[in-house]
């Protein structure tokens, strides 16, 4: 049987009498106009106000995005995260938002290499944000960049990335369709301690 493993495939033998193959459903049809679909989602989100109405001059905007830790095949460029972030940045610029940071939501995963960040974000975004220090990777063990936001009923301290806590708006670019990924838990695992 052929398995996806890391960046490659491996061929493995499985015992026929103790193995069962479960096939996934057919893939979803591709989106013909990804940029249009992204823009439509930002202008017409489910159960939320359109992004442009939330953007105000002088605000702190933080855009978090998935790291490269999941063993999924690399996307062709442009990566969907790049497309999402470009659309958000365009709307932010139109609204006069200048204080924008990009954070790779690593949680406790390994740091991404610069070439991985460039693959995810594209050269233009990387070159615009990385040299200024406004593109960085969350470090759940860097306590100087964490802030306490409360504690659980059991007394466990809740810490989150300081920039995220201080932001007026946080946008998260998540692109995976796997059962254990995405949604609010991307924040609680990606940019918390």
Where are these regions (language model features)?
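Conserved active-site and cofactor/substrate-binding residues in soluble primary-metabolism enzymes
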Residues: 29, 33, 37, 79-83, ...
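Short coil-to-helix leader/linker segments, especially the first N-terminal amphipathic alpha-helix
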Residues: 30-49, 144-149
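An acidic, phosphate/nucleotide-engaging active-site surface
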Residues: 110-185
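N-terminal amphipathic/basic leader segments beginning at the initiator methionine
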Residues: 1-39
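A short, gly/pro- and small-residue-rich
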Residues: 183-193
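N-terminal active-site beta-alpha-beta segment that forms phosphate/nucleotide-binding
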Residues: 48-113
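Short amphipathic alpha-helices and their capping/turn segments at secondary-structure boundaries
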Residues: 42-56, 157-166
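Amphipathic alpha-helical segments in well-structured domains
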Residues: 81-85, 118, 191
């Amino acid at each position: 049987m052929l398995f996806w493993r890391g960046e490659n495939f491996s061929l493995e033998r499985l015992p026929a009498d103790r193995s069962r193959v479960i096939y996934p459903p057919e893939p979803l049809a591709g989106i013909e106009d990804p940029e249009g679909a992204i823009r439509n989602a930002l202008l017409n989100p489910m159960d939320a106000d359109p992004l442009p109405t939330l953007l105000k001059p002088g605000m702190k905007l933080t855009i978090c995005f998935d790291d490269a830790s999941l063993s999924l095949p690399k996307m062709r460029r442009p990566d969907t995260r790049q497309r999402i972030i470009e659309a958000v940045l365009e709307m932010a610029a139109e609204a006069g938002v200048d204080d924008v940071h990009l954070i790779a939501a690593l949680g406790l995963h390994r740091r991404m290499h610069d070439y991985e960040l460039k693959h995810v974000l594209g050269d233009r975004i990387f070159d615009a944000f990385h040299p200024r220090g406004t593109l960085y990777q969350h470090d759940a063990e860097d306590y100087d960049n964490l802030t306490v936001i409360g504690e659980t009923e059991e007394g466990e301290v809740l810490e989150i990335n300081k920039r995220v806590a201080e932001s007026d708006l946080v946008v998260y670019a998540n692109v995976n369709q796997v059962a254990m990924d995405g949604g609010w838990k991307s924040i609680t695992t990606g940019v918390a301690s």
